[in-house]
A protein has these predicted regions:
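Generic N-terminal amphipathic, Lys/Arg-enriched alpha-helix
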Residues: 1-21
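Amphipathic, non-membrane alpha-helical segments in soluble helical-bundle scaffolds
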Residues: 2, 24-27, 31, 199, ...
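Short, glycine-rich nucleotide/cofactor-binding loops
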Residues: 16-26, 106-115
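A short, well-structured juxtamembrane/interface segment
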Residues: 22-37, 90
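Flexible, glycine/charged-enriched surface loops at secondary-structure junctions
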Residues: 22-29, 44-46, 218-227
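Glycine-rich phosphate-binding loops that contact phosphosugars or nucleotide phosphates
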Residues: 39-211
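YjeF_N-associated NAD(P)HX repair module
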Residues: 180-182, 190-253
Length: 255
């Protein structure tokens, strides 16, 4: 019997390969949309609530990534993500500070796709004329009801949907048999599971998206505004020079 890490490695890589096959056509459609935005001097905005903020941050100020990616950051870390209206106010405040401009792109990330804040941020961005890309688990989204008053999920309000392919509950490795004695709940699952995949696959999908954008920029002979690791000689100066063009538009200051 394989160990738990071996089981995770095998299953997670299967899901990663499936995510590539599922999302490749969507990524191909998105590359020119994001590429044209970058070529015009526009900004790619991201938002993820709760743990999904970690996925969002993967492409913000990232070595090897685009300088023009920035993020809407929730100061409550998702604690009140289901308070109706909070996401709208969060997006509006960010809009006042950094601007959400027509023709730009918002990537909204929510594994469940059911929580209010990502839906409201996406709706605000669409009203401002941005292209909205959702990164979610369609299986998880379909398995749970929406928390938003409209009853809609994130995938319902997006222009394009990327599916991280995570299973409902996110975890994929059976850890131990559940207690099936008389004391066990009648609704207890047959096993406990660990090893979530939404972060692993979500970050991979976003990196595929960034690389597809760079591929389009390269093929169309546009500059490639790629950040360098600040730990390399001369990188800080290089990154600051790139960021000058976006002064006031980036929510995360570069070193």
């Amino acid at each position: 019997m394989p160990s738990l890490p071996e089981s995770y490695f095998t299953r997670a890589n299967e899901l990663l390969a499936r995510a590539w096959a599922t999302n490749a056509p969507v990524l191909a459609r998105l590359a020119p949309i994001l590429g044209e935005c970058v070529a015009r001097g526009g900004v790619i905005h991201t938002f993820g609530s709760g743990h999904s903020e970690l996925v969002s941050r993967e492409i913000i100020g990232r070595a090897g990534g685009l300088v023009c990616v920035t993020g809407i950051i929730d100061p409550t870390a998702g604690f009140i993500e289901n308070l109706p209206g909070y996401g709208t106010r969060l997006a509006a405040r960010y809009d006042r500070q950094h601007q959400l401009l027509p023709g730009e792109v918002l990537i909204a990330i929510s594994n469940s796709g059911k929580n209010c804040s990502p839906i409201e941020v996406a709706l605000h961005a669409r009203q401002k004329g941005l292209t909205v890309v959702a990164l979610t688990s369609l299986a998880m989204s379909q398995a749970t009801p929406s928390e938003h008053p409209s009853g809609k999920k994130l995938s319902d309000v997006a222009d394009h949907v990327l599916d991280n392919g995570s299973v409902p509950g996110d975890a994929i490795v059976e850890v131990f048999p559940a207690d099936l004695s008389a004391k066990a709940s009648a609704t207890a699952e047959a096993s406990a599971k660990a090893g979530p995949t939404s972060t692993l696959i979500g970050c991979s999908v976003l990196n595929w998206l960034m690389l597809g954008t760079l591929d389009w920029l390269k093929q169309n002979k546009h500059p490639l505004p790629i950040l360098r690791s600040q730990n390399l000689p001369g990188a800080i100066e290089h990154n600051r020079d790139l960021a000058q063009k976006y002064k006031g538009r980036l929510s995360r200051q570069l070193a």
